[in-house]
A protein has these predicted regions:
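Active-site-proximal alpha-helical scaffold in enzymes
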Residues: 43-66
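Acidic, glycine-rich active-site loops and adjacent beta-strand->loop/helix elements
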Residues: 44-49, 71-77
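Conserved active-site beta-strand-loop modules that form the wall/rim of enzyme catalytic pockets
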Residues: 65-68, 93
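Conserved donor sugar-nucleotide recognition element shared by glycan-biosynthetic enzymes
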Residues: 21-22, 49
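Conserved "HGTGT" condensation-loop signature of ketosynthase/thiolase-family condensing enzymes
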Residues: 2-16, 22, 27-38, 72-173
């Protein structure tokens, strides 16, 4: 598609190209549901999940309402694998709320760290490790694994240069 856009006879329409952009699903959802709230879209390669988690957390605190955090990416075409390989499709959604309810599974304490932090990773099963290494959008599986096992855990997600996002997870019983 990227090559086709540059060809003189334009074998791809601007609409087809527009629909391939990472924020078009959010835009179409907002139009269809007549939603007027914020709908940030981020593209930060391996740092997309920690960046989205920080952005969603800021929105929860700023607007005092729940946020649907969706991270996804699709398998990248072979020519892009040298630059940024995505081995399979993955999408994960989390609902972040400003206060606890009877449906709350865990309390998250999310902090920005202005320096890289020693990874305090939990033992993950080989299939989870493979998923996480094959698509950066699978990074929340670490957190979801802790929530599912109802364990209190602390983990770090590498963010931009010399920074990380710290997540402390405490289950709600």
């Amino acid at each position: 598609m990227c090559n086709a856009v540059t060809l003189p006879d334009h074998p791809i329409s601007p609409t087809q190209f527009h629909n391939s952009v990472y924020n078009s699903p959010a835009a179409y959802w907002c139009i269809a549901t007549q939603t007027r709230g914020p709908s940030p879209s981020l593209a930060c390669a391996e740092a997309s999940f920690p960046g989205a988690l920080l952005s969603a957390t800021a929105n929860v605190f700023t607007h005092k309402q729940g946020v649907l955090l969706v991270v996804y990416d699709v398998e990248s075409p072979k020519p892009f694998h040298k630059q940024y390989a995505i081995e399979f499709n993955c999408g994960i959604a989390l609902v972040l709320m400003p206060s606890q309810s009877e449906n709350t599974l865990a309390k998250l304490d999310i902090n920005f760290q202005s320096r890289k932090t020693e990874e305090m990773d939990m033992a993950l099963s080989p299939p989870l490790v493979k998923l996480i290494s094959g698509n950066a959008s699978a990074q929340p599986l670490r957190m979801l694994s802790a929530v599912a096992s109802q364990d209190s855990r602390e983990m770090f997600y590498d963010y931009l240069e010399n920074s990380a996002v710290e997540v402390k997870i405490n289950p709600c019983n």
